[in-house]
Amino acid sequence: MERGLWRAGSVPGHVRLAFGRTGEGPEPLLALHGITAQHRAFNAVARHLRHPDGMVALDLRGRGDSEKPPPGNYGLDAHARDAIRTLDHLGLERGILVGHSMGAFVALQAALLHPDRVRALVLLDGGWPRPEEASDADEAAIQEGLERAFGRLDMVFETPEDYLDFWFPDQNLTLEDLPPDLADYYFYDLARVDGGFVPKAFREAAEEDAGSVFSESPTAAELEGVGCPVALVRAAEGFFPGTDPLISDEARDVMAQALDLRSERLLSEANHYTMLLLEEYARQTASVIRDFLRRLG
């Protein structure tokens, strides 16, 4: 199901990284997806954004069509190095990084470790400060949300429609029933194997990365070391409808104090996933990014 939005490319090296690219310009945005996703999560945002230089959306190591090294090769530092390696491959001295969910933490880590290489950051419902002492309730809420996403990674689905039934139970959907951007996202998420289809994301990679986010992401004090301009887009709901947002108002205030926050928006009816995957919210997300880029000049 190739829709023509992305041109496939790869970053060579000790871990080969796959990416999709839109546009032809010399300074594309670099987009980094969430913990079990892949670059097609940015389908709708990239299409609505129409950035003049385009977008390069990476399949993080262990996801999509990128290589999947064994456990011990993941974590925020490894992904941040991959982001910089991608900038090198693209010939970009300094890049604008757009990160959703875990991708936002990767973008922050890249800005902290390589401040001379990151011009600006767009954080999409991720990158909140790691508390000095995490509460059991907060960790449990995030773990509960991740469990559903992680659970599918060990499953074999007889058909793509069975995969849709996992996400949309009892709706009997086919790929043709979904908006094209969303259908393409779910189809690309699958690899064909004997007996059916499996999600491309490597579970051990996701688990290692979750541990890295919980234990190694920046604290509020460390966020103050990010020297570049930042845009923040938050979803009003968490992983599921009716759940608390992942970035609370209190966490947002801490981020606003620590970071050079130039643009922000709260998507009032979106959740952590729909802010990218559903048309109406992806359009709003793209609008914030466009406004932020205009302000950067």
For every predicted segment, state its role.
Residues A256-E269:
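Catalytic histidine neighborhood in serine/cysteine hydrolases
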Residues L267-E280:
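Catalytic histidine-centered segment of alpha/beta-hydrolase-like enzymes
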Residues A191-A258:
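Conserved serine/cysteine hydrolase catalytic core
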Residues P12-T22:
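A short loop-to-beta-strand scaffold at the N-terminal edge of the catalytic core in hydrolase folds
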Residues P131-K200, A206-S217:
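Helix-rich cap/lid subdomain of alpha/beta-hydrolase
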Residues E93-D136:
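Conserved hydrolase catalytic core segment
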Residues V56, L60-V98, A270:
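Active-site loop/oxyanion-hole signature of alpha/beta-hydrolase fold enzymes
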Residues G20-K68:
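Conserved HGGG/HGGXW glycine-rich cap/lid loop of the alpha/beta-hydrolase fold
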